[in-house]
Amino acid sequence: MIASVRGEVIDIALDHAVIEAAGVGYKVMATPSTLATLRRGTEARLITAMIVREDSMTLYGFVDGDARDLFLTLLGVSGVGPKIALATLAVYDPQALRQALADGDVTALTRVPGIGKRGAERMVLELRDKIGPVSAGGGAAVGGHAIRGPVVEALVGLGFAAKQAEEATDKVLANDPEATTSSALRAALSMLGKK
């Protein structure tokens, strides 16, 4: 399978990037924070997981192997598919997710779009012993104004001026301080599209 993709970033969208490698453009699904690290026209390398279904083959890209491994571990949970696994990593970085699972924090896990209380309880039950160690420093969920940087970077990567991106992001976060990276990015794009 395809374990990584390296090449020129041809396009960046809300939920994916297209990376051209050896003359082939690979559509790679990724979290907003991963997409924020990419710049159109520059070379990039993403660690990938290839998910093959009866009717599709989809690449999911990550900044590092740790995030990819956690994504694959999440897929082992009953009822969790690639979209929910990716949404989980969009809301929580790997360290924060490990901490929530280790603490059995069902409430934190229900903040992920598509995960209800039962799904969160199932995740904790099935993954508590499978996840890697949690460092002493712990991790923080992506939330509030901690997501400002990744959202602004993603907007700039999509071609908006830095000042426009910052203003739109600040307005979105003022209206919804609990917004996730992906919801803030969507709202900012919607706001910028109306101008």
Swiss-Prot record:
* Entry protein name: Holliday junction branch migration complex subunit RuvA
- Region annotated Domain III sits at 150-195
List the keywords (alphabetical).
Answer: Cytoplasm, DNA damage, DNA recombination, DNA repair, DNA-binding
Region of interest (Domain II), ranges: 64-142
List localization entries. Cytoplasm
Q: Domain annotation text?
A: Has three domains with a flexible linker between the domains II and III and assumes an 'L' shape. Domain III is highly mobile and contacts RuvB.
Its organism's taxonomic lineage begins at: Bacteria, Bacillati, Actinomycetota, Actinomycetes, Mycobacteriales
Q: Which organism is it from?
A: Mycolicibacterium smegmatis (strain ATCC 700084 / mc(2)155)
According to the record, the residues making up region (Flexible linker) are: 143-150
**GO molecular function annotation:** ATP binding; four-way junction DNA binding; four-way junction helicase activity
Subunit field text: Homotetramer. Forms an RuvA(8)-RuvB(12)-Holliday junction (HJ) complex. HJ DNA is sandwiched between 2 RuvA tetramers; dsDNA enters through RuvA and exits via RuvB. An RuvB hexamer assembles on each DNA strand where it exits the tetramer. Each RuvB hexamer is contacted by two RuvA subunits (via domain III) on 2 adjacent RuvB subunits; this complex drives branch migration. In the full resolvosome a probable DNA-RuvA(4)-RuvB(12)-RuvC(2) complex forms which resolves the HJ.
Q: Which GO terms describe its cellular component?
A: cytoplasm; Holliday junction helicase complex; Holliday junction resolvase complex
Give the region (Domain I) as residue ranges.
1-63
What InterPro entries does its record include? Answer: DNA_helicase_Holl-junc_RuvA_I, Hlx-hairpin-Hlx_DNA-bd_motif, NA-bd_OB-fold, RuvA, RuvA_2-like, RuvA_C, RuvA_C_sf
Tell me the function of this protein. Answer: The RuvA-RuvB-RuvC complex processes Holliday junction (HJ) DNA during genetic recombination and DNA repair, while the RuvA-RuvB complex plays an important role in the rescue of blocked DNA replication forks via replication fork reversal (RFR). RuvA specifically binds to HJ cruciform DNA, conferring on it an open structure. The RuvB hexamer acts as an ATP-dependent pump, pulling dsDNA into and through the RuvAB complex. HJ branch migration allows RuvC to scan DNA until it finds its consensus sequence, where it cleaves and resolves the cruciform DNA.
Q: Which family does it belong to?
A: Belongs to the RuvA family.
Its BP terms in the Gene Ontology are: DNA recombination; DNA repair
Per the record, the domain of life is: Bacteria
